[in-house]
Amino acid sequence: MSDERLETLQEIGTAFARTRPPEPDTPMPAQPTLSDIFNLRLNTPKFGLPIAAAGHCTQSAAAALAAGMDEETVLACLLHDIGLAVARPDHGWWGAQLVEPYVSEKVSWAIRYHQALRYYADESVGYAYPQMYVKMFGEDYQPPEYIAAAHEHARQHKWYMRARNITLFDDYSFEKNPTWSVEPFTDIIGRHFRQPKAGLGNDASPTAHMWRTLIDPSKPL
């Protein structure tokens, strides 16, 4: 190997290495649980967002619980924006895929399709198009075709209200520093979230790699 090539490879290695301290994430337990994810990873804003997913999601779940929704709807509200801890675009799809091995099909379906439904008002159930989106996208915004197709599919589906309920209990005020806790949902999580014994990210599920990314996003490779 030439000296020039060796130098190039070393430069690339340096670029991929942890050249700065990782994000100030608290170390995770050896066998991470969903509550650990909320308390230690979703507790801080990601990807430039002004709020943390934990506060927003627990507010949504609390609203659903107070309204007397069934436990799977409450869990779907609790998890609906967990995908934002992995990626901002298409967070509904990311979130649904992330939790799919651990929840019922109803819950993951609702999480997946809430993203499309949030762009479309449904006056019959009291859901108005959020003013926040007018500010984000403009008065005449038209969602892309895949969002429109997902909305139409969900609208005709027997589980439509599963996803629509997430939008109804979404908190569009998005408080910046809400007081929140995942503890009120511990029993619901225990009954409806299949926690792997090895811990999230350590099991052989199809999405274990996604949990590992969420847990340690600053790994070089």
Question: Which ranges hold each PLM region?
Answer:
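Metal-dependent phosphohydrolase cores
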Residues: 1-78, 82-221
